[in-house]
């Protein structure tokens, strides 16, 4: 059965390109895994797939199994140990702060990704397809990928409302249900709704209004709006400066009668993380290259081999997305 093992499907939509939709998708996926959920990310931005680059796995390739295509693993689930359970019980007897630490220390879920970027021979190859071929590719992604047991499947979509969105909506409404009563073994996956991503500017929020109308016309519930790039946080003093404006997404959500999930200022640390740089790297690229050359010659190059999810916990934006993840879990699972 297509989408077998998937419990909930969330679409990530945006009206315009460049609002950070793919980075929001990834951060929400990482935050959900840190809540103990197994997560899949399906990238259907066929002409501009970003997920392989963001997770640092551009060289990965899709493998085939008897059940279908196997998604690329970003990190595996962390098993709960007996000693971990004992520690949790011991700490829970001490009260307040310790209980919060135990809650944060819950075993993380797995994260897997599927993208056309993994199927291209070269990452620079252009995808020049007409609508019917895009539609066929999206249907194949939805029917031929074996996700296994997955709590949440996040679908990273292209900006706007294009052929991809129409094909996705039509196929998902056949393969899933929007009813919250769909539970149990053999039940259809639940299309829980869409998260809309915008920046504060009016030119972006005006296009997100079209996404809200798209959801209404296709009977896809709207879970909420995230206002991305809502200011810049100085890494030295922590002061937030509004580079563009602020509050546009919140005003739009209120006017459209949609839940406003929150604002996310620009996180320089997350940008460095997905670009493969450390926070301490110099802004002077020439000096940086020279230093790396010397370190390589000395064999002293430091490579942080921790999983992406563990390094992400050090980004201050993790706190924002942890809140979004908890809100969505509470809304969806009750």
Swiss-Prot record:
Give me the comment on cofactor binding.
Answer: Binds 4 [4Fe-4S] clusters per heterotetramer. Contains two stable clusters in the N-termini of nbp35 and two labile, bridging clusters between subunits of the nbp35-cfd1 heterotetramer.
Domain of life of the source: Eukaryota
Q: Which residues bind ATP?
A: 15-22
Recorded hits in Gene3D superfamilies, A to Z, give: P-loop containing nucleotide triphosphate hydrolases
- One MF annotation (Gene Ontology) recorded for this entry: ATP hydrolysis activity
Q: Where do the annotations place [4Fe-4S] cluster binding? A: 234, 237
Required cofactor(s): [4Fe-4S] cluster
For the region Disordered, give the residue spans. 274-302
Keyword tags:
4Fe-4S, ATP-binding, Cytoplasm, Iron, Iron-sulfur, Metal-binding, Nucleotide-binding
List this protein's GO terms for biological process. Answer: iron-sulfur cluster assembly; tRNA wobble uridine modification
What does UniProt give as GO cellular component?
cytosol; cytosolic [4Fe-4S] assembly scaffold complex
Purpose: Component of the cytosolic iron-sulfur (Fe/S) protein assembly (CIA) machinery. Required for maturation of extramitochondrial Fe-S proteins. The nbp35-cfd1 heterotetramer forms a Fe-S scaffold complex, mediating the de novo assembly of an Fe-S cluster and its transfer to target apoproteins.
- Family, per entry: Belongs to the Mrp/NBP35 ATP-binding proteins family. NUBP2/CFD1 subfamily.
* Subunit architecture: Heterotetramer of 2 nbp35 and 2 cfd1 chains.
Q: Which PANTHER family match?
A: CYTOSOLIC FE-S CLUSTER ASSEMBLY FACTOR NUBP2, NUCLEOTIDE-BINDING PROTEIN NBP35 YEAST -RELATED
State the name under which the record lists this protein.
Cytosolic Fe-S cluster assembly factor cfd1
Which species? Emericella nidulans (strain FGSC A4 / ATCC 38163 / CBS 112.46 / NRRL 194 / M139) (Aspergillus nidulans)
